[in-house]
Amino acid sequence: MTDSTCALSKDAVEPGFALVQAWRPSSALNPGLARTLRLAQSVIPSLRGEQGGVPPADALCLGSDAALHALRDHWAQAYPEAGALYLALRCLGLAIWQPIYLCVIAVHLEGAVPQLAGLAQPVKTGFPGGFHLPVHAPVDGSFVERMEAAAAEMQAFCNAVRRALKPLVVLHDRAADRLQAECVLGALMAVRAHTSLSAADVIAMGEAWLASLGIAGGCGFFAYRARDGTPALALERKVCCHHFRRRDGEKCSTCPKRSLDARIACLLAEAS
């Protein structure tokens, strides 16, 4: 996970989020979906998914704004000094990173692509952690077919989140595009260790993902040498998350406000 996404995760229906009340436990779990959930957790252990059952009443889910209001209020009260831009990107990033990682991991590890419309994310002390999905048959097929399905799911989900957030926070479209792009490429970086993708493959796949989502150029990669001299990649982020404006914050190691040399120095220091 990237430094900014680690901060997020810590240790088409009506736009918005809803409190889930209508689900019922089911013994008829879908095996394809179960496999996808296992794959996701094998890459990111905190990405714990369940199918069926009833998620907590305060879970984030497409359809109404109640839980999103609570998320906004939590972070506004926790760090009022960080400002409006921090608040907007914090809420957006927290709401979208898990479904984005789930979809990208599914595509690259040959899993079936889940539908995101019914996804609910339990929230604890301001952090969505894990998720619930209704029992359903995810989309299988060739790599291209699964990538197209995943892009459509992510685009619909993220657009709905953004529509719901805009009345609540100061969210600019370009910044939102760039944060979404960062999450997608962060997921690609995370899954790379579980594949045979070369650096060139990762760069090409990153461009393909962002193009499929209509956010081309929103994030990229830069190459550097690790401490042992081996080539490495890091995210070339295009938007600052404003974490440094918090009373306990500092600039992320790959913050676009840092020079390239400073970003590389931070990455090397973190690896030591």
Give each language-model segment a name.
Residues 1-88:
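Generic N-terminal leader/targeting and pre-domain segments
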Residues 107, 192, 253, 267-268:
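Short linear functional motifs in flexible/disordered or boundary regions
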Residues 187-190, 194, 247, 258, ...:
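Hydrophobic alpha-helical segments
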Residues 222-234, 239-245, 269-272:
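Active-site-proximal "nucleotidyltransferase
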